[in-house]
Amino acid sequence: MSEKVPTTTSTPTTRILAIGTINPDVDQAKVFEILPNEVRETVDLYLDGKIDQWYSLQDRRGVVFILNVTDPTVAHEMLEKLPLGQAHLMSFELIPLGPLKQLRRLPGMTPKPQ
């Protein structure tokens, strides 16, 4: 007897991965001038529970945030309010994250009613 593999069901977005990099041809002196305020405001977002985790990029200047936000538009607006965003010195790539939906294909998993 073969088990039915559930069809693909949607999974919710539970976090946003935000990869921030300094824009090309930016004067680094401007970045360093703004950086202390950027760090303080980023810490505030962390303490407010908006940023879950943060890391630095190893291959170039930039940061990675795992945001406790589910809407990319909200994430974009939040990050653009940071000092480097307001100065148009940093840009973010936003990637919605969710549960590993492939786990639904494990034997014995049954689709949940929607």
Residue ranges of each PLM-predicted region?
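Conserved, structured core segments of small domains
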Residues: 1-114
